Amino acid sequence: MRIPSTQALRALVSFARHGTVWQAAEELNLTRSAVSHQLRMLERDLDFHMLDRVGTRVELTAQGRAYADDVRQALLAISGSAFAITFPWPGND
């Protein structure tokens, strides 16, 4: 197992939110091919099946949805921490 890239994790979260590679690509300002590639690399790096592919349709498995939710929460926590140190409140040293 390799630690996944943040770009791949963001692609997963966006895909989970929108349900399509096309909408995830629009949100991330990437091509559909780039998002699909990130999702494939994420599965490879984790050695974990999280996507079901039927023809051209791609859907998250139940475990994939659970992982995407965990990743979303982790990215929000990282973003919140970055905001807190960048814009500290008085007395919150």
Residue ranges and their predicted role:
Residues M1-H18, S36, R65-A68, R72:
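Short alpha-helical elements of helix-turn-helix
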Residues V13-N29:
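Short helix-boundary/capping micro-motifs
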Residues T31, Q38-M41:
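Residues within the DNA-recognition helix of helix-turn-helix
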Residues E43-L60:
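A short LG(V/I)-centered, amphipathic sequence patch enriched
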Residues S79-F83:
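A short, exposed helix-loop element centered on a Lys and neighboring polar residues
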